[in-house]
């Protein structure tokens, strides 16, 4: 069985800012190796290098997969903001292969309520967070209630804990050791690092 655990549903201009597209284009011009199936790596138009992953492109790129986890990043700090209803609607139309996960910005005052809505109302089954894209310190105790809620809901969490082409993204929040406090405080929270 082939499972793709990390796919995105988002496209320009609906979910990405012009600034994000400029950063993506600069990364491409710097010879960053991207998948031409989803990310238009060979295209010279900067707006085609926006990391577009439309429903059609996602279906085509994952055709050989038995199961696919898909999410739409909620990271307005760096210029990406995907409505979680978009992911839920897409998954409802492709339940045979796709598993929808949500993304919540831990900086939002109502992030715990957003997570509950995404899981209990929309039916999304995991949480995607990205400190470098969302500009949050995983060690800050103010974020712990979100991960306690994910643990209580018994959903897995995937972390983008690596570098990025997005210039405003603080690399200091991408160090995996920063997740230790959450792991200790939430011993039953399943965490994956991407």
Model-derived segments and spans:
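Helix-coil boundary/capping segments in enzymes
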Residues: 1-194
């Amino acid at each position: 069985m082939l499972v793709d655990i990390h796919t995105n549903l988002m496209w320009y201009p609906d979910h990405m800012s012009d600034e994000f597209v400029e950063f993506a284009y600069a990364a491409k011009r710097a010879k960053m190796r991207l998948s031409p199936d989803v990310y238009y790596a060979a295209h010279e138009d900067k707006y085609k290098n926006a990391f577009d992953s439309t429903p059609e492109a996602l279906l085509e790129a994952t055709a050989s997969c038995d199961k696919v986890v898909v999410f739409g990043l909620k990271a307005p700090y760096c210029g990406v903001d995907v409505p979680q209803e978009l992911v839920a609607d897409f998954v409802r139309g492709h339940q045979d292969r796709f598993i929808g996960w949500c993304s919540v910005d831990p900086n939002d005052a109502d992030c715990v309520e957003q997570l509950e809505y995404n899981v209990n109302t929309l039916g999304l089954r995991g949480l995607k967070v990205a400190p470098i894209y969302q500009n949050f310190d995983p060690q800050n105790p103010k974020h712990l209630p979100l991960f306690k809620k994910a643990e209580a809901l018994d959903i897995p969490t995937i972390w983008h804990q690596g570098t990025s082409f997005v210039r405003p993204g603080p690399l200091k929040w991408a160090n995996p050791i920063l997740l230790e406090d959450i792991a200790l405080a939430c011993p039953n929270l399943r965490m994956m690092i991407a």
